[in-house]
């Protein structure tokens, strides 16, 4: 997936120690400013060719392309009857969908954003689904607590990615699974892959999904632009379109991989 200029700056900041201070204020602001009640997914989009055509409830249909990425990532493992942890759950749309459709025994969704967690606790009420405020680099759970750990388009914001991977390994039970999707500029791919290789986790599958994400963004662009126009003041709209990933946000060079 390509990075816009705004995303380049954000990605650079994400690898510094000021990261938590920035995200500490940005995500609560987004929760309030972009209309959280309709924005239950904050991951970018995904669609295959031919389309995945997942059977969705009518209330899920507007978020189809967001759900596609969650579904494709999570179904790399069997969640049925499993203890699942999602790290960086955003506004909880993915947690809700996966809990309703894939039958985990329990689903714990964690995020650093306290406003987002409060929203999730008020919005998503399902048996076995729990939302917790916490840090991806210091997970507040006992060793070997989960069968599956899920992370969707979030770890590029972690300043200490190897520490996050250590935490994933710590909370996974023996034989557990880490299901993961994210983005890096091409200049950081080698470092990214080296960190994954050093984490002590066996890689079972891997694929690049640039085309699928761009296709999903194209489909979602009209809705994304309307959402930005409705909820953000004029001087923030360009940054908002860049952040949410709308077709035509300049520049989008082909120098990143997912």
Curated annotation (Swiss-Prot):
Q: Superkingdom of this entry's organism? A: Bacteria
Cystine crosslinks: none
Q: Which InterPro entries match?
A: Erg6_SMT_methyltransf, Methyltransf_11, PthPhpthDimycoMt, SAM-dependent_MTases_sf
Keyword list, A-Z? Lipid biosynthesis, Lipid metabolism, Methyltransferase, Transferase
The cross-references to Pfam families, in alphabetical order and at most eight, read:
Methyltransf_11 (PF08241)
EC no. given is 2.1.1.-
UniProt entry tagged with the keyword Transferase? yes
GO BP annotations of the record are: methylation; sterol biosynthetic process
- Belongs to which family? Belongs to the methyltransferase superfamily. Phthiotriol/phenolphthiotriol dimycocerosates methyltransferase family.
What is this protein's function? Answer: Catalyzes the methylation of the lipid moiety of the intermediate compounds phthiotriol and glycosylated phenolphthiotriol dimycoserosates to form phthiocerol dimycocerosates (DIM A) and glycosylated phenolphthiocerol dimycocerosates (PGL).
* Protein name per UniProt: Probable phthiotriol/phenolphthiotriol dimycocerosates methyltransferase 2
Species whose genome carries this gene: Mycobacterium ulcerans (strain Agy99)
């Amino acid at each position: 997936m390509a990075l816009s200029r705004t995303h380049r700056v954000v990605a650079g900041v994400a690898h510094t120690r000021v990261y938590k201070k920035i995200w500490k204020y940005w995500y609560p602001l987004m929760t309030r400013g972009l209309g959280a009640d309709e924005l239950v997914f904050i991951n970018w989009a995904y669609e295959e060719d031919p389309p995945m055509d997942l059977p969705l409830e009518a209330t899920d249909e507007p978020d189809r392309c967001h759900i596609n990425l969650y579904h494709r990532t999570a179904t790399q493992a069997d969640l049925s009857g499993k203890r699942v942890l999602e790290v960086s759950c955003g506004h909880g749309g993915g947690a809700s969908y996966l809990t309703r459709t894939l039958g985990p025994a329990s689903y714990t969704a964690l995020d650093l954003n306290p406003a987002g967690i409060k929203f999730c606790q008020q919005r998503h009420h399902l048996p076995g689904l729990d939302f917790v405020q916490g840090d991806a680099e210091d997970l507040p759970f006992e060793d070997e607590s989960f069968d599956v750990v899920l992370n969707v388009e979030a770890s590029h914001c972690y300043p200490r990615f190897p520490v996050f991977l250590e935490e994933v390994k710590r909370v996974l039970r023996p034989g557990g699974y880490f299901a993961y999707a994210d983005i890096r500029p091409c200049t950081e791919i080698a470092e990214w892959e080296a960190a994954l290789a050093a984490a002590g986790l066996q890689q079972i599958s891997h694929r690049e999904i640039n085309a699928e994400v761009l296709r999903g963004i194209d489909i979602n662009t009209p809705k994304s632009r309307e959402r930005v126009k409705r909820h953000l003041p004029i001087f923030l709209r360009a940054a908002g379109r860049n952040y949410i990933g709308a077709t035509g946000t300049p520049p989008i060079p082909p120098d990143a991989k997912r």
